[in-house]
A protein has these predicted regions:
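Active-site nucleotide/adenylate-binding loops and adjacent lid/helix of ATP-dependent enzymes
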Residues: 1-73, 131
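Helix N-cap/coil-helix junction residues
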Residues: 8, 143-144, 178-180
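Short small-residue beta-strand/loop micro-motif enriched in glycine and branched aliphatics
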Residues: 38-39, 115-116, 169-173
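Phosphate-binding site of ATP-dependent enzymes
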Residues: 46-125, 153, 158-159
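A generic alpha-helix structural signal
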Residues: 52-59, 105, 130-138, 182-186
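Internal helical hairpin/lid segments
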Residues: 112-121, 127-147
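C-terminal hydrophobic structural anchor segments
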Residues: 138-165
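C-terminal active-site "lid" helix and adjoining low-complexity regulatory extension at the edge
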Residues: 157-211
Length: 211
C-alpha cells in the first residue's frame, strides 16, 4: 500500500474484492470499503455471525474492502497540516475523546462539538515520529491541499489509521487560526493539474443510502 511505500507503519490488513471468498480467522475486526471514508460502510465485526451482514453493507458502496484487527481502547491521535512554499504548517496533535466508534452521522451531523481541541503532548520522540510520518504521507501526493492524518500509538510505535481529505481534513478546531491558514494555502496553490472527475462512488453511496 501507499503508506508502506513511503515508510509509514500500518496495521496488518487483508484485501478482498466482491468476487473473493472472505475468510476471517480472528475477531473482532474492522471492515472498510477501500475507496470511501467518513465511516461510510464501515463495521466493527465481533463474530462470524456478524460478518455476512457487514460484507453486504460494505459491498453496497465499493467493490473492494480491507479488513483490519479492531483494537478496543487503542490510543488515537489526529494531526492536520499542509505545506506552503516548501514549509510544513501543522495543527496541534489531538487525542479525540470519543465513543468506541463514530459513524457518518456522529462525525458530520452532530453539532454538539463547539470548543477547540485540546493539545496532547506525547513527548519529543512520538511527536516527531507522528510529524515525520505525516510529511512522508503528504509529499508529492497531496501537494496544495490540507489533510488530516489519524494515527494509532501501540507500544510506543506510530501506525497510520487513515488519511482524511475533504471533508475530514477540514478540522478547523485543530488550528488556532484556520481562516488564515486557508488563505495561505489558497494563495500559494501549485500549478494546476488536470484531475479526472468520476462520480461512480457518489452514485453508489446515493443508491445504497436509498435502500
Amino acid at each position: 500500500g501507499y503508506a508502506k511505500s513511503v515508510g509509514v507503519n500500518v496495521l496488518d490488513y487483508k484485501y478482498f474484492t466482491n468476487k473473493d471468498s472472505v475468510k476471517v480467522d480472528m475477531f473482532p475486526v474492522i471492515l472498510k470499503p477501500v475507496k470511501l471514508g467518513s465511516s461510510i460502510g464501515v463495521s466493527i465485526v465481533k463474530n462470524q455471525e456478524e460478518l455476512s451482514y457487514a460484507l453486504d453493507v460494505a459491498f453496497e458502496f465499493d467493490d473492494a474492502i480491507i479488513i483490519e484487527p479492531f483494537i478496543s481502547g487503542v490510543k488515537e491521535y489526529n494531526l492536520a497540516g499542509t505545506k506552503v512554499n516548501g514549509e510544513f504548517i501543522f495543527s496541534i496533535i489531538e487525542e479525540p475523546q470519543k465513543a468506541e466508534f463514530l459513524d457518518f452521522d456522529k462525525k458530520y451531523l452532530d453539532f454538539s462539538r463547539t470548543s477547540k481541541a485540546k493539545e496532547v503532548d506525547l513527548g519529543d520522540k512520538l511527536n516527531l515520529e507522528i510529524k515525520e510520518s505525516f510529511k512522508n504521507l503528504y509529499n508529492t501526493l497531496f501537494e496544495g491541499s490540507i489533510i488530516r492524518c489519524d494515527f494509532f500509538v501501540i507500544d510506543n510505535k506510530v501506525y497510520l489509521n487513515e488519511i482524511n481529505s475533504i471533508p475530514g481534513s477540514m478540522a478547523n478546531y485543530l488550528f488556532s487560526d484556520f481562516q488564515e491558514l486557508f488563505t495561505k494555502v489558497a494563495s500559494n496553490l501549485p500549478t494546476k493539474k488536470d484531475i479526472p472527475i468520476n462520480f461512480e462512488y457518489v452514485n453508489k453511496i446515493q443508491v445504497a443510502k436509498g435502500k
